[in-house]
Amino acid sequence: SIIDIGGESTRPGADFVDRFSELNRVSPVVDGMANLGIISIDTRKADIARAGILKGAKIFNDVSSLSFDPRSLNVLAETGASVCLMHASGDPQTMQVNPTYDNVLLDVYDFLSLKVKLCLDAGIDISKISIDPGIGFGKTLEHNLLLIRGLSLFHGIGCPILLGVSRKRFIGEIGKAQ
């Protein structure tokens, strides 16, 4: 199992957390749990990822797919950590404001393919990369259902697929939509 530790909520509408506060939140938790299993550091910030990895985290779980902080790719290359690249349209404050796609499956696939290529070009081995289509992040109920139905498409990228399942509001909306 993987223990994912983060100090900044990335749910839609969440407020930004400064680096100092985020580091103070995650450092003692990573310290206390590093020996309990595989630790993932859930952050968009390169310095928080580096600190977590140096304390024992093995995975950099970045909901921005290395887009938020330009130093993130260097942290991966320098530390040898694994990465989970997630698709999210916009940032937590704006991602649910009228999310639109030409074709959600192909748009998310193309985005993640480009991010994987970016990592490969930086020397990160494909065995260190996983992808997450970002269910609930900048997507409508219809988008989420299309992504779940078409999940097998993402195997074409050549990386393991991870899905975050915490607090998925759309699950409750499915019953209302039927």
Regions found by a protein language model. Name each.
Residues T10-I39, T43-D47, I53-L54, K58-L118, ...:
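Active-site-adjacent loop and "lid" segments of alpha/beta metabolic enzymes
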Residues I135:
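Active-site metal-binding loops of divalent metal-dependent hydrolases
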